[in-house]
Amino acid sequence: MSAANFGSREGDTIGLKVTETSTGRYFFYIPGCAEVEPPLARRLKGASLVFFDGTLFTDDEMIRQGLMQKTGARMGHISISGPQGSIAAFKDLGVARKIYVHINNSNPVLDENSPERKAAEASGW
């Protein structure tokens, strides 16, 4: 999506591509993202570093924990797990280093010993 179309769809969020002008090296910072659509996937493919939305491990995490009645998708956040989650979305993008940011305190990946943390780490996060 181009900047000219930003805000034309519900769920649009801003991500940044930060470039060192003298070297051309860059990274992406995307703290909120509802879905990794093909145009975004094409931009991220082969990147050396991406900081990405790690708000929730599962879409219904906040509901299951009794914290609120909104899903991650409704709040504009892709889940880490599942067939539409960020682990699956990044699987074939060839990103060298991936770091989750904006991790909600309800997210079990914060627990170093949790199976969710181990799944994220095993997937290169």
Regions found by a protein language model. Give the residues of each.
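Short Pro/Gly-enriched beta-strand edge/turn motifs at strand-loop
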Residues: 1-3
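Cap/insert and terminal regions of metallo-dependent hydrolase folds
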Residues: 6, 10-15, 22-26, 34-125
